[in-house]
Amino acid sequence: MVKVGVNGFGRIGRLVTRAAFNSGKVDIVAINDPFIDLNYMVYMFQYDSTHGKFHGTVKAENGKLVINGKSISIFQERDPANIKWGDAGAEYVVESTGVFTTMEKAGAHLKGGAKRVIISAPSADAPMFVMGVNHEKYDNSLKIVSNASCTTNCLAPLAKVIHDHFGIVEGLMTTVHAITATQKTVDGPSGKMWRDGRGAAQNIIPASTGAAKAVGKVIPELNGKLTGMAFRVPTPNVSVVDLTCRLEKAAKYDDIKKVVKQASEGPLKGILGYTEDQVVSCDFNSDTHSSTFDAGAGIALNDHFVKLISWYDNEFGYSNRVVDLMVYMASKE
């Protein structure tokens, strides 16, 4: 089982750790966060406003974080190059601070003894992998990879299925996205993106997202054919993708439902879900899929122009894919 270090114990860092313990697929051996001391880590891991209390034991003991009886080394370094991952036995590092997202910055982890780095965010220059879409293109010469964004992980599996069966000529995506930590609780300053600084709980906020364009990186045939935007809405978690696209081959909406359902039960099982139930966002809280197609919500204008809807837990679904990507990478060592 691959031994993993987590850098940044925020939403994704904590939930990757939860996903690791829930699945038993990877072994968390170290955590680094300069802003959270050990006792605070115990509290933050144990209690979660969105996903509920951790079902297990958490305590601090001899300067280590102990989860379900497993001791985890704790570091509090600001500079990734100074974290002694090697001493803790961490082979892979999940870079989940949201700060060190380039090859150069994330590469600092290799200096401390890590063998590979998985960036839990889109990256300007690191190769991006989406489980179920292009993960098989990974080869073990790559030391630093990106797990793309939660939205790309939702959109790409759906886009792949649709493109493989009917061909996507072009498309626009909108994600109606839950609040994240980059937003403000009340109006505040926000650099160049003025709207992003408006109160998150009070507003529907139009925002930019690179998620749709990033699909072109993981599915090269769709490069230049998709773009999109986001609306940030006042919900704590769970988001939904609306993909409106023109199809090459004529397809009835029932044909689309059929191929997505087949994919969800076959090659994309566990990654792409399918539902015909009358669901709403809360129904996907703590869901582990990257994307769940909502058969009842989509519409077709005609046989070539459709709007497709897919839900995702932008925190927990994504965190589970980070774990899955590491398991896949470890299988190629």
UniProtKB/Swiss-Prot annotation:
Has both glyceraldehyde-3-phosphate dehydrogenase and nitrosylase activities, thereby playing a role in glycolysis and nuclear functions, respectively. Glyceraldehyde-3-phosphate dehydrogenase is a key enzyme in glycolysis that catalyzes the first step of the pathway by converting D-glyceraldehyde 3-phosphate (G3P) into 3-phospho-D-glyceroyl phosphate. Modulates the organization and assembly of the cytoskeleton. Facilitates the CHP1-dependent microtubule and membrane associations through its ability to stimulate the binding of CHP1 to microtubules. There is a cross-link at K184 (Glycyl lysine isopeptide (Lys-Gly) (interchain with G-Cter in SUMO2)). The modification N6-acetyllysine is found at K59, K192, K217, K225, K252. It is found in: Cytoplasm, Cytosol; Cytoplasm, Cytoskeleton; Nucleus. The record marks H177 as: Activates thiol group during catalysis. The modification Phosphothreonine is found at T151, T175, T180, T182, T209, T227, T235. The modification Phosphotyrosine is found at Y40. GO terms for molecular function: glyceraldehyde-3-phosphate dehydrogenase (NAD+) (phosphorylating) activity; microtubule binding; NAD binding; NADP binding; peptidyl-cysteine S-nitrosylase activity. Pathway: Carbohydrate degradation; glycolysis; pyruvate from D-glyceraldehyde 3-phosphate: step 1/5. The active site is at C150. The modification Cysteine persulfide is found at C150. D-glyceraldehyde 3-phosphate binds at S149, C150, T151, T180, T209, G210, R232. The modification N6,N6-dimethyllysine is found at K3, K64, K192, K213, K225, K258, K261, K332. The modification N6-malonyllysine is found at K192, K213. This is Glyceraldehyde-3-phosphate dehydrogenase. GO terms for cellular component: cytoplasm; cytosol; GAIT complex; microtubule cytoskeleton; nucleus.
